[in-house]
C-alpha cells in the first residue's frame, strides 16, 4: 500500500468541512479526555462496499460486483483479512484511522458466529455487516490544531501520481467551502412515537423472561423495544440529519460520536461505551455497568462515586459482565496473555460517571479482524448471561433482527487495529422515519412495568434531541 499525505494548520473545523458534502462519514469524540477526544475523522468517498446478510456476501467496487452464497461469513473473513498493510511512519501510526473499513456490525452477526442461532426465525431486512472501503480521509488533531489529509491505494492500487492528484483534490475542498448559515428547520408536525411492541405485550415478555430466570435457565436477559416517528424532513433530509448529529453532540456528549450518510439509511449515534479495540497486538474490552449522575461540587462528586461503588446490586452485575468479557477475550487471545488491567474503577463524563473495568489479551495472529469482532459480539451489556442462552431466549420471544442496535460501529484500520463503539444511543434514519431502540436488563426480581419505563426513558432521552 502506498500512502501520501500532507499536514496542514487547520483552516476549518470538522463540522464545517463535513457540512458542505451530502454523503460523509464522521467519527469523533465529544469527551474532554485527552486520550479520547483528540481526533476527528471525516471521509467523503468510498471505493466500495462490503455487505453481509444471513445468506450472502456482496462486494461492490467500481470494477466488479461479487455475490458469494457459499460460506459467506468465511468469505468475508478472508476478504477483509487480505487487506493488511504496515504503517511505517510513526506520525501516521499514531492516528486512529487512515484507510480501511468503516461501518457497522449488527447484533445479528452472532447468528454467523453461532450457527445454532439460525434455527430461530428473525424477521427483518437489515444487513449483518455493512462496511465502506475507505482510501482517503481527513484526520483532525485537535491538540495540535492540524489536519492530516491522507490518500492511499489500499483497495484501488492507484499509482503514486494518481494518489498525489487525489490529495490535491482533497486539499482543494477547503477552497470550495462556503461558510453558510445552518439550514433553517421547517415547521414539523408534533412527533407521534410508535413502538414496535405494545406495552401489554412487552410486559408479558418480561414476565416470561423472569420465569425463565427463576427456573435457573439464565441470570439476566436484555430485551428491547423499537421506537420510531415520521420525521417529514423531505428534501432537507441530509442537512437536517447532520444538524441533528451536531445537536446530539452538544446535548449528549459521549466518547463515541458517529454519523454515517453514504446513500442508505443514516446512522446518528452518541455511545458511551466501547465494544472492542485492537491496538499493538492487544485486544481490549471495557465492561461498563453501574451509572450515577455527576455531583455539583467535587465533594458531592466523590460522595456519589463512593455510593456507586458500595451498591452491591451494581457491583454484582458488573462482576458478571467482567466474567463475560474474560470468557470472550479467552477465545481469541494467546494462552496465558489474559489480563484484568482495571477492575471497577470510576470513569467520569460530562453528566454521569460509570463503573468501568478493562480486560485485555494478546490477539492470536492467525485470526482476522472479523474473528475478533464476532467473538465478542454482542456484549453481555446488551444480551445477558449466560450470553448464548440469553440470545436464544431473545430470539424466541422477540423474533426480529435487531440490526445496528447493540452491535458495533467504527472502523478496521489498514494495519488491522480496530475500534468499535457499542451501538446504543443510536438512531437509524431513513427517508420517512427516525428509529431508536432501547433495552432493559431483566433479572429475577425485575418489575415488568419498571423495565418498560426504562426503555421509554432511554428512547426519550435520545429522541428528544431530534429536530
Residue spans for each PLM region:
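Extended alpha-helical targeting/anchoring segments
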Residues: 1-467
Amino acid at each position: 500500500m502506498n500512502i501520501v499525505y500532507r499536514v496542514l494548520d487547520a483552516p476549518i473545523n470538522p463540522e464545517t468541512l463535513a457540512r458542505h458534502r451530502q454523503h460523509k462519514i464522521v467519527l469523533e469524540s465529544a469527551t474532554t479526555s485527552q486520550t479520547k477526544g483528540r481526533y476527528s475523522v471525516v471521509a467523503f468517498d468510498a471505493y466500495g462496499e462490503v455487505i453481509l446478510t444471513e445468506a450472502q456476501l456482496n462486494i461492490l467496487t467500481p470494477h466488479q460486483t461479487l455475490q458469494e452464497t457459499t460460506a459467506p461469513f468465511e468469505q468475508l473473513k478472508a476478504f477483509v483479512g487480505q487487506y493488511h498493510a504496515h504503517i511505517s511512519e510513526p506520525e501516521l501510526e499514531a492516528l486512529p484511522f487512515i484507510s480501511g473499513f468503516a461501518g457497522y456490525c449488527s447484533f445479528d452477526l452472532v447468528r454467523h458466529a453461532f450457527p445454532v442461532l439460525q434455527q430461530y426465525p428473525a424477521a427483518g431486512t437489515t444487513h449483518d455487516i455493512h462496511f465502506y472501503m475507505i482510501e482517503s480521509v481527513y484526520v483532525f488533531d485537535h491538540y495540535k490544531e492540524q489536519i492530516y489529509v491522507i490518500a492511499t491505494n489500499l483497495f484501488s492500487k492507484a499509482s503514486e501520481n494518481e494518489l498525489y492528484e487525489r490529495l490535491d483534490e482533497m486539499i482543494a475542498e477547503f477552497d470550495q467551502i462556503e461558510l453558510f448559515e445552518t439550514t433553517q428547520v421547517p415547521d414539523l408536525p408534533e412527533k407521534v412515537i410508535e413502538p414496535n411492541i405494545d406495552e401489554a405485550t412487552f410486559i408479558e415478555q418480561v414476565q416470561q423472561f423472569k420465569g425463565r430466570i427463576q427456573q435457573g435457565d439464565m441470570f439476566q436477559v436484555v430485551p428491547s423495544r423499537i421506537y420510531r416517528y415520521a420525521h417529514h424532513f423531505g428534501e432537507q433530509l441530509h442537512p437536517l440529519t447532520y444538524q441533528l448529529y451536531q445537536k446530539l453532540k452538544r446535548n449528549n456528549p459521549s466518547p463515541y460520536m458517529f454519523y454515517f450518510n453514504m446513500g442508505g439509511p443514516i446512522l446518528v449515534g452518541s455511545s458511551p461505551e466501547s465494544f472492542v479495540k485492537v491496538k499493538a497486538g492487544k485486544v481490549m474490552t471495557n465492561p461498563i455497568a453501574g451509572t450515577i449522575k455527576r455531583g455539583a461540587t467535587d465533594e458531592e462528586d466523590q460522595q456519589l462515586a463512593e455510593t456507586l461503588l458500595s451498591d452491591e446490586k451494581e457491583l454484582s452485575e458488573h462482576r458478571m459482565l467482567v466474567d463475560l468479557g474474560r470468557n470472550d477475550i479467552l477465545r481469541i487471545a494467546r494462552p496465558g496473555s489474559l489480563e484484568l488491567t482495571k477492575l471497577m474503577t470510576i470513569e467520569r463524563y460530562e453528566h454521569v460517571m460509570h463503573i468501568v473495568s478493562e480486560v485485555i489479551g494478546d490477539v492470536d495472529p492467525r485470526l482476522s479482524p472479523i474473528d475478533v469482532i464476532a467473538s465478542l459480539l454482542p456484549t453481555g451489556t446488551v444480551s445477558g448471561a449466560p450470553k448464548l442462552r440469553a440470545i436464544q431466549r431473545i430470539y424466541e420471544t422477540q423474533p426480529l433482527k435487531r440490526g445496528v442496535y447493540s452491535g458495533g460501529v467504527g472502523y478496521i484500520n489498514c494495519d488491522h487495529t480496530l475500534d468499535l463503539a457499542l451501538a446504543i444511543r443510536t438512531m437509524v434514519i431513513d427517508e420517512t422515519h427516525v428509529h431508536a431502540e432501547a433495552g432493559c436488563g431483566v433479572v429475577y426480581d425485575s418489575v415488568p412495568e419498571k423495565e418498560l419505563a426504562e426503555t421509554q426513558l432511554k428512547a426519550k432521552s435520545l429522541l428528544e434531541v431530534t429536530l
